[in-house]
Amino acid sequence: MYDASDLRKGLKFEIDGDPFVIVDFQFKKPGKGQALYKCKLRNMISGAQFERTFRSGDKFNEASLEEHDMEYLYSEGGNFCFMNSVSFEQEFLGKDQVGDAVNLLKDNTVCTVLFFNGKAIGLTLPNFVNLRIVQSDPWAKGDTATGSTKPATLETGYEIQVPPFVDEGQLVKIDTRTCEYVERVNE
C-alpha cells in the first residue's frame, strides 16, 4: 500500500483495478492546507495519459506486476510472439503493446515482458541492441564537417542517423532508449 507521499516519477500503482505509471510529478505545498501531488499518469494497458491531483493522506494499492525475460520469435498479422526461455510458454503482444520497440526488434532478441494479473501488457527492450545496416549512402572523403551524419536503414527497416564512416553491411550498436547510434561492433 502506497501513501501519497510515496508518489515519484516511474512509480507503478493501481487505480480502479488498472495499472498506472507516473510519467511526470509535481509536489505543491500551499501556505495553508494539505500538500498536493500533481501527477501525469499513463494507463499501462490502454496507453491513455491524463493528469490527476492527489492530496496527502490518499492511499494506493501496489500494482501486481511481474516481469519475465522472453525471447522474440516472430510477428504475424500485427501480433508479436514471445517465448519464455524457462517454461517455453508463448505469449502474443499486439502492435499497440509493443509500441516503438517494433523499430528495433529482431528475431531472438531477449526482452523483458511485463505482466498484470497474468496477462502480458507491454515490453522493454534491452538497453542496447546490435543491428546490421542494410542501406546507407557511400561516404565521400572530404565531407568531414564536424558532427556530420547520414541516414542509414537498419535490418528492421528503421532509419537512423549514423556517422559518415559507417558503411552498408556493418553491425552497429543502438541505444534502445533513444534509438540512436552508439558505436560500430566488431564481428
Swiss-Prot record:
Gene3D superfamilies: 2.30.30.30, Nucleic acid-binding proteins (2.40.50.140)
Pathway annotation from the record: Protein biosynthesis; polypeptide chain elongation
Gene Ontology biological process: peptide biosynthetic process
Superkingdom of origin: Bacteria
GO MF terms, alphabetically ordered: translation elongation factor activity
GO cellular component labels: cytoplasm
CDD domains recorded: S1_EF-P_repeat_1, S1_EF-P_repeat_2
Compartment annotation: Cytoplasm
Keywords annotated in UniProt: Cytoplasm, Elongation factor, Protein biosynthesis
Family from the record: Belongs to the elongation factor P family.
NCBIfam families: efp (TIGR00038), PRK00529.1 (NF001810)
Protein function: Involved in peptide bond synthesis. Stimulates efficient translation and peptide-bond synthesis on native or reconstituted 70S ribosomes in vitro. Probably functions indirectly by altering the affinity of the ribosome for aminoacyl-tRNA, thus increasing their reactivity as acceptors for peptidyl transferase.
Protein name per Swiss-Prot or TrEMBL: Elongation factor P
Gene: efp
